[in-house]
């Protein structure tokens, strides 16, 4: 049986493309590679569980202590036992190999939205100048997606216009004392010379501050890293039951390899993940939304795009610690574990850096202790004294500062090589100087040695491999994401982005996927 549309991937892009089609009455099949059920997050409040839960090692480290042992993982979320099924097996299943680059993806239902930071923003006109459609073409889709998933963080601050989302966002949850003190001083001293060019405000998040459908608002449990039992943090997996009720079909456990042209549609070739047995699915149209890297591997294999080097966009990262010097040694208190504040800085070159500030009090202490350059016992003491007076910062830099390449070998393996140069180092050093000066003006210090560059690819913001063009060549996409050389195959994820801003891109990707779904629903009837 040939479906009207098969969507490969059930992450944010896949479900956003699906909704307009399902609502229009199309026969839509969503396919992902998930097997089994996800491990539920712990129940309770983080600090209370740390004091009282006699089985906390199970969710902190895992039965095999993998969270403690796996020091190679680029992010704390990759070591969380309850999230192991989100990440495991991705590169192997999709035949992806890397050199100097972290290729992270998900085979789980909901994809990487099971473990993302929930940061959202709307790309502005300048950031979308290279996209071959009008910025206003996304207006209806931004509104629909934002209302569907629920946003918070609305504030009259320096970042309202920058994020462009406050008409759809609710108020944000309360800030902890460190974040509240930092933003209060910033608002009082915005004219200070050290703060010129640095914009600071509330983080805008796909987080509920009031109930939405079956999802409950945030209760500040502090367990965000492990997953949210209340559904306050958005995951595309939350939408799958509603899509099925509306008429969509689901097929799980299938890893897609390539697509073959038929006389009147397409045949999707894959393997059953649990058995390795080959399987096929037929459809009039196919939408690839498996995440940029997996989507690229599928598309390039289908196009026989062998031994041709292509770019991979990704945001270089850096991390740092801010210390509030006036309040060392406070006892930790319950509070938020998600990003509380965001910042934006534009370099003299005009390029943008974006970042967020978190409380470390609801993250495993060993994630910080291991970076303190002293003995383990001394590091624990230092962190016990200072940890409750710190904020953790992460920063995303322009994708143009890195030069990653991908190539598909004739045996179908996608190989990605990470590359960067002195320009990236200089930009990180420049941002570090900005923050050191700004922190002093705000009553904080950047802890010495803490402004460190992350592994290339560890941002997990991959894009640009199948870029949109006004007149696409083979292997590029048109203004709706249709893949040149494969009419009837569409790309819904960030592989279509011709450029990648440092600003969070997921909501823009979802709006583009919604626009694609509306387009497909309008050009043919079921």
Regions found by a protein language model. Name each.
Residues 5-30:
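N-terminal Rossmann-like FAD-binding beta1-loop-alpha1 element of flavoenzymes
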Residues 89-90, 201-206, 217-224, 231, ...:
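A glycine-rich dinucleotide-binding beta-alpha-beta segment and adjacent secondary-structure elements
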Residues 2-3, 276-285, 289:
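Core beta-strand elements of the Rossmann-like FAD/NAD(P) dinucleotide-binding domain
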Residues 56-72, 77-83, 93-98, 102, ...:
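Conserved redox-cofactor binding core of oxidoreductases
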Residues 10-11, 33, 290, 494:
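Glycine-rich Rossmann-fold phosphate-binding loop(s) that bind the pyrophosphate
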Residues 258-280:
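Conserved beta-strand-loop-beta-strand element in the redox core of flavoprotein oxidoreductases
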Residues 35, 46-84, 284-392, 526:
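Mid-to-C-terminal "cap/lid" subdomains and adjacent gly/pro-rich loops that border
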Residues 22-47:
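Glycine-rich FAD pyrophosphate-binding loop
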């Amino acid at each position: 049986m040939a479906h009207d549309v098969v969507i490969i991937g059930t992450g944010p892009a896949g479900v956003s493309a699906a909704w307009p089609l399902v609502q229009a009455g199309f026969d839509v099949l969503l396919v992902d590679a998930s097997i089994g059920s996800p491990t539920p997050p712990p129940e309770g409040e983080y600090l209370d569980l740390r004091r009282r839960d006699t089985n906390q090692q199970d969710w902190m480290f895992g039965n095999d202590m993998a969270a403690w042992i796996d020091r190679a993982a680029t992010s704390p979320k990759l070591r969380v036992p309850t999230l192991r099924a989100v990440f495991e097996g991705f590169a192997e299943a999709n035949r992806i190999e890397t050199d100097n680059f972290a290729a992270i993806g998900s085979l789980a239902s909901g994809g990487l939205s099971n473990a993302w930071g929930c940061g959202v923003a709307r790309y502005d006109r300048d950031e979308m100048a290279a996209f071959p459609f009008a910025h206003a073409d996304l207006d209806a889709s931004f509104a629909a997606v934002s209302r569907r998933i629920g946003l918070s963080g609305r504030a009259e601050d320096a970042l309202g216009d920058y994020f462009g989302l406050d008409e759809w966002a609710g108020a944000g949850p309360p800030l902890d004392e460190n974040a509240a003190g930092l933003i209060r001083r910033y608002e009082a001293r915005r004219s200070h010379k050290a703060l010129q060019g640095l914009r600071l405000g509330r983080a805008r998040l796909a987080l509920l501050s009031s109930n939405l459908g079956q999802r409950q608002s945030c209760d500040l449990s502090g367990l965000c890293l492990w997953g949210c039992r209340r559904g306050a943090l958005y995951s595309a997996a939350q939408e799958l039951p509603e899509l099925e009720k509306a008429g969509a079909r689901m097929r799980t456990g299938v890893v897609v390899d390539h697509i073959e042209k038929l006389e009147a549609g397409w045949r999707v070739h894959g393997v059953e993940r649990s058995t390795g047995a080959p399987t096929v699915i037929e459809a009039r149209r196919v939408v690839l939304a498996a995440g940029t890297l997996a989507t690229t591997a599928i598309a390039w294999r289908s196009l026989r795009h062998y031994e041709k080097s292509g770019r991979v966009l990704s945001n270089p990262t850096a991390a740092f610690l801010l210390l509030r010097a006036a309040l060392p040694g406070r006892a930790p208190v319950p509070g938020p574990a998600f990003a509380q504040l965001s910042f934006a800085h534009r370099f003299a070159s005009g390029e943008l850096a974006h970042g967020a500030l978190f409380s470390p009090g609801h993250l495993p202490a060993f994630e910080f202790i291991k970076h303190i350059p002293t003995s383990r016992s001394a590091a624990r003491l230092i962190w016990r004294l200072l940890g409750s007076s710190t904020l953790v910062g992460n920063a995303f830099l322009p994708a143009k500062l890195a030069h990653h390449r991908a190539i598909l070998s004739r045996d179908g393996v996608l190989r990605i090589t990470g590359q960067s140069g002195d320009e990236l180092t200089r930009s990180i050093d420049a941002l570090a100087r900005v923050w050191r000066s700004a922190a002093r003006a705000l009553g904080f210090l950047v802890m010495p040695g803490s402004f460190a560059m992350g592994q290339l690819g560890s941002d997990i913001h991959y894009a640009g491999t199948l870029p949109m063009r006004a007149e696409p060549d083979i292997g590029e996409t048109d203004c709706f994401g249709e893949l040149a050389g494969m009419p009837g195959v569409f790309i819904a994820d960030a592989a279509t982005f011709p450029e990648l801003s440092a600003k969070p891109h997921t909501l823009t990707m979802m709006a583009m996927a919604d626009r694609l779904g509306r387009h497909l629903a309008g050009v043919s009837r079921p």
